[in-house]
């Protein structure tokens, strides 16, 4: 009997929900939570261990989390490693991809995971492993787990894995020599394809070329002291009554909120409606996501000309790239009308960061220098944000509530200052700016 190990997050490992998203890595003998379902559909293998780690812990302390999990595996024998399914949960998808990639590289064992097409982990890891095409929520658990097991069973049995479209995983960009059953030569196939194209019929290319959507880096701000700076967020900060009825996930709406005369955003007046993380910290102090207080300080010091009268907000969790791009284009109109010179984008969880980076590209495409502040740097980088400043966490990007107000302020002030400086820097390639606090 072969041995398998499964990685799960805190939810599917039955530890808890968002309140346990900081759960530290743990390895358990046998099957827990979703691992029991996997064990029931594996053939010729048994899930001997279940690894559980909170999504926020993996996202915020990735190196430590990976190191500890690698330590768990040092004395374990296993023939295959699986993770998920992650559905459309961005943090979970990125975590599954990260740990599978390291396990594959270190232990030279096959790895399998599953994600929805809109999960940012797909673009990040589909070339490195079998990423099964999954559903968008846990209602697809049984189907997605069975699909993972189907490929795993073939691997365990030493059977040949077929093409991506037949097996149900995302194409990995690998080409193999294949003998067609019909024996039709390339010369005939290309003529058939051309005739279909000329007659307007559907046809399938044998060599898909991936499209690159990198945006030219906008010209930097020359004089920050005269510039108007706006904040856009995918972190869901809105007035407490949510006047624009922005959805808490898979958003199709956005809002613009007047901050004229406000020194900071007060809890109880503003809140987050974002369903992708524990809202407690952001509800208590919305400035940890929309750093109005820090921007006002820089405005008074003369570092920037002024803060734009409005901030713009939507929810990024589960939001499709198409909707993100559309909303960004609509916001661009308002930015132009408001005479904005530069933009700071703040983002939180995985799909939220993917949504934010997609919006960043559209805003930069319109000519605005823009920087994305986020915790999940690999997601922003993969999607194509050109200027990135790290934040400290998913639920509270710019202020850890477990620290003093003074410490939170110093961190927020410093990192927002770094973002403002980034708007003035002329870079020729994607750049992650270093922070000191």
Curated annotation (Swiss-Prot):
Q: Signal peptide: which range, if any?
A: none
The reaction(s) annotated as catalysed by this protein in its Swiss-Prot or TrEMBL entry are:
acetyl phosphate + trimethylamine + [thioredoxin]-disulfide + H2O = glycine betaine + [thioredoxin]-dithiol + phosphate + H(+)
Q: What's a Pfam family in this record?
A: GRDB
- Please name the catalytic residues of this protein: 349
One molecular function GO term is: betaine reductase activity
Could you tell me the keywords of this UniProt record?
A: Oxidoreductase, Selenocysteine
Parts of the chain that traverse the membrane: none
Enzyme class, broadest EC rank: oxidoreductase
Q: Which domain of life is it from?
A: Bacteria
Among its keywords, does the record have Disulfide bond?
no
Q: What is its EC number?
A: 1.21.4.4
Whom does it interact with, and what assembly results?
Heterotetramer of two alpha and two beta subunits. Component of the betaine reductase complex, together with components A and C. PB is substrate specific.
- What family does the entry list? Belongs to the GrdB/GrdF/GrdH family.
**Function field:** In the first step of betaine reductase, the substrate is bound to component PB via a Schiff base intermediate. Then the PB-activated substrate is nucleophilically attacked by the selenol anion of component PA to transform it to a carboxymethylated selenoether and the respective amine. By action of component PC, acetyl phosphate is formed, leaving component PA in its oxidized state. Finally component PA becomes reduced by the thioredoxin system to start a new catalytic cycle of reductive deamination.
Indicate what this protein is called per its UniProt record: Betaine reductase complex component B subunit beta
Species, as recorded: Peptoclostridium acidaminophilum (Eubacterium acidaminophilum)
Organism taxonomic ancestry:
Bacteria, Bacillati, Bacillota, Clostridia, Peptostreptococcales
């Amino acid at each position: 009997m072969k041995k398998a190990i499964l990685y799960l997050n805190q939810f599917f490992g039955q530890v808890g929900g968002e309140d346990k998203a900081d759960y530290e890595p743990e390895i358990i003998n046998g099957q827990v939570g979703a691992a029991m379902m996997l064990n029931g559909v594996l053939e010729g293998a048994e899930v001997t261990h279940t690894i559980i780690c909170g999504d926020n812990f993996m996202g915020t302390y990735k190196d430590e989390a990976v190191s500890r999990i690698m330590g768990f595996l040092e004395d374990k024998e296993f023939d295959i490693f699986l993770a998920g399914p992650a559905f459309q949960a961005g943090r979970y998808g990125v975590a599954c991809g990260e740990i599978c990639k390291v396990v594959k590289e270190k232990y030279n064992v096959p790895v399998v995971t599953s994600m929805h097409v809109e999960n940012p982990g797909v673009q990040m890891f589909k070339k490195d492993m079998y990423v099964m095409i999954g559903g968008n929520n846990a209602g697809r658990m049984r189907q997605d787990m069975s699909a993972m097991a189907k490929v795993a069973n073939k691997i365990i049995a030493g059977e040949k894995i077929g093409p991506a479209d037949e097996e149900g995983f995302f194409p990995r960009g690998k080409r193999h020599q294949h003998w067609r059953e019909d024996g039709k030569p390339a010369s005939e196939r290309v003529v058939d394809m051309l005739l279909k194209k000329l007659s307007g019929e559907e046809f399938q290319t044998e060599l898909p070329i991936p499209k690159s959507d990198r945006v030219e880096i906008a010209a930097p701000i020359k004089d920050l002291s005269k510039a108007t700076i706006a904040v856009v967020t995918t972190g869901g900060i809105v007035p407490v009554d949510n006047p624009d009825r922005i959805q808490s996930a898979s958003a199709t709406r956005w809002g613009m909120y007047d901050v004229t005369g406000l020194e900071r955003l007060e809890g109880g007046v503003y809140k987050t409606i974002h369903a992708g993380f524990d809202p407690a910290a952001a509800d208590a102090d919305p400035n940890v996501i929309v750093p109005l207080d820090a921007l006002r300080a820089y405005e008074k010091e003369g570092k920037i000309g002024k803060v734009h009268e409005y901030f713009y907000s939507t929810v990024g969790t589960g939001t499709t790239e198409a909707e993100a791009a559309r909303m960004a284009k609509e916001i661009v109109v308002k930015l132009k009308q408001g005479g904005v010179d530069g933009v700071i984008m703040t983002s939180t969880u995985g799909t939220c960061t993917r949504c934010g980076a997609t919006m960043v590209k559209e805003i930069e495409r319109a000519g605005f220098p823009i920087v994305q502040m986020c915790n999940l740097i690999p997601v922003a980088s993969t999607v194509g944000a050109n200027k990135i400043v790290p934040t400290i966490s998913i639920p509270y990007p710019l202020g850890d509530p477990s620290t003093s107000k003074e410490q939170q302020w110093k961190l927020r002030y410093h990192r927002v200052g770094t973002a403002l400086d980034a708007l003035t820097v002329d870079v020729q390639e994607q750049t992650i700016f270093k922070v000191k606090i």
